Amino acid sequence: MTFINRWLFSTNHKDIGTLYLIFGAWAGMVGTALSLLIRAELGQPGTLLGDDQIYNVIVTAHAFVMIFFMVMPIMIGGFGNWLVPLMIGAPDMAFPRMNNMSFWLLPPSFLLLLASSTVEAGAGTGWTVYPPLAGNMAHAGASVDLAIFSLHLAGVSSILGAINFITTAINMKPPALSQYQTPLFVWSVLITAVLLLLSLPVLAAGITMLLTDRNLNTTFFDPAGGGDPILYQHLFWFFGHPEVYILILPGFGIISHVVTYYAGKKEPFGYMGMVWAMLSIGFLGFIVWAHHMFTVGMDVDTRAYFTSATMIIAIPTGIKVFSWLATLHGGTIKWDPPMLWALGFIFLFTIGGLTGIVLANSSLDIALHDAYYVVAHFHYVLSMGAVFAILAGFTHWFPLLTGFTLHPTWAKAHFGVMFTGVNLTFFPQHFLGLAGMPRRYSDYPDAYTLWNTLSSIGSLISMTAVIMLMFIIWEAFASKRKILQPELTTTNVEWIHGCPPPYHTFEEPAFVQVQE
């Protein structure tokens, strides 16, 4: 098999998963570089980069790169492709060629996003791309149009991937295996895929109408022609809120596996509760979108509903957190690097969840909307939730993917540096938000200097952690410590073929004997 046949025309779920992981790692470094530019600008009062337009282009690109080209490709494309077929005993994904197309739509999409910043003044709209700022008056030229096309491609990629994962998870498992006997990671990817399938078409509709408003003189979002910019916000957030659950749900699945494994348990605590909690989160995620819009002047009854509905999501989330803690209870805990990431995840995700409950209150949110408190909140659940879950999964399954082991001491040190960095970066932002510092500005009054400086120092510590991780991965490949026989394979099906598994697995159907 030639290099080109293997890597460009691949129909193998393991190879495509590897492509997704490499692409996501690369995009993650681009997104990190952008975030360091943001923190460099905000490290001291005064201007570093120039005007707010270039600053907002960087902020917008940082969000898009991290969401669409780092977290989703790694969690869904990388871990999803590698593990879902192995965990259900399928020979591959249901639609292997469509799987390849889903991946190869992402590099062109990334290219279009980068192109958007090189023409005119760039797309400095924020990741929400709200009109009228995103309209053709405030953003003349092709920048926003290129960003919209980038989102179109990334969206098509995700929709096709979602169809593939739904079909695979439901139809490719052995007949004897009920859906309620599949591992939690498979469930998490299945639910994520359903969310993608239902939410992305709404985003596509919204940005397509924005595209025609900009180029074909329609007025969907222009009051002068009977349109309404608030309609765009509803369409965007009907996608945008499920999207944040799309980013965290596969992480929930990863953490369930890692915690169970390193607590020495043969199953997670409360399997059914975990499944129904994820199903509930997936459903509720669709009926809370307007909590992002408490400041647009909605009716008081509407605000009351969205406040209460948002708070209800804390219940299934709490079920998951306490089930992880119950899984740990009474276990023989192995303090390996993946376990450290998982414990860090549980702690920091819970803090992020608590600030989310604060922001759910529509009255409080009037004061905190577009302030740094919101930035702190969602970076606790993303930068320390999604990213910690990715690193837990990566350190846990690295031997499965490569056949080599990471250096345990280096990996623990990396956790320590990263934990320090992200907390020093984002904890002070709660204080800035409560003190009234607004988001998306490149400068600030000098009263805010202390916490901003600390936050920027934290970002440099996190950068050090990223460099450490690159070294740790290099060291693992250079030292070639092989895994001879993985343990606990009876309850962790993905490991039964050895490390790494052969190119083709389950070529003949798996024999499944269901325990009564």
UniProtKB/Swiss-Prot annotation:
Protein's name in the database: Cytochrome c oxidase subunit 1
GO molecular function: cytochrome-c oxidase activity; heme binding; metal ion binding
Topology feature Mitochondrial intermembrane, residues: 42-51, 119-141, 214-228, 288-299, 359-371, 435-447
A Pfam match: COX1
Membrane topology field: Multi-pass membrane protein
Residues engaged in binding Fe(II)-heme a: 62, 379
Cross-link annotation 1'-histidyl-3'-tyrosine (His-Tyr), location: 241-245
Assigned keywords, A-Z: Calcium, Copper, Electron transport, Heme, Iron, Magnesium, Membrane, Metal-binding, Mitochondrion, Mitochondrion inner membrane, Respiratory chain, Sodium, Translocase, Transmembrane, Transmembrane helix, Transport
Enzyme class: translocase
EC number: 7.1.1.9
Main subcellular localisation: mitochondrion
An annotated GO cellular component: mitochondrial inner membrane
Binding site for Mg(2+): 369-370
Gene label: MT-CO1
Known function: Component of the cytochrome c oxidase, the last enzyme in the mitochondrial electron transport chain which drives oxidative phosphorylation. The respiratory chain contains 3 multisubunit complexes succinate dehydrogenase (complex II, CII), ubiquinol-cytochrome c oxidoreductase (cytochrome b-c1 complex, complex III, CIII) and cytochrome c oxidase (complex IV, CIV), that cooperate to transfer electrons derived from NADH and succinate to molecular oxygen, creating an electrochemical gradient over the inner membrane that drives transmembrane transport and the ATP synthase.
Presence of the UniProt keyword Metal-binding in the record: yes
Cofactor note: Binds 2 heme A groups non-covalently per subunit.
Residues bound to O2: 245
UniProt-annotated binding residues for Cu cation: 241, 291-292
BP GO annotations: electron transport coupled proton transport; mitochondrial electron transport, cytochrome c to oxygen
Segments on the Mitochondrial matrix side according to the record's topology features: 1-12, 88-95, 172-183, 263-270, 329-336, 402-407, 480-516
Domain of life: Eukaryota
Binding site for heme a3: 377
Cofactor(s) listed in the protein's UniProt record: heme; Cu cation
Family to which the UniProt record says this protein belongs: Belongs to the heme-copper respiratory oxidase family.
Pathway(s) this gene product operates in, as recorded in its UniProt entry: Energy metabolism; oxidative phosphorylation
Amino-acid positions noted as binding Na(+) in the UniProt annotation, renumbered to this chain: 41, 46, 442
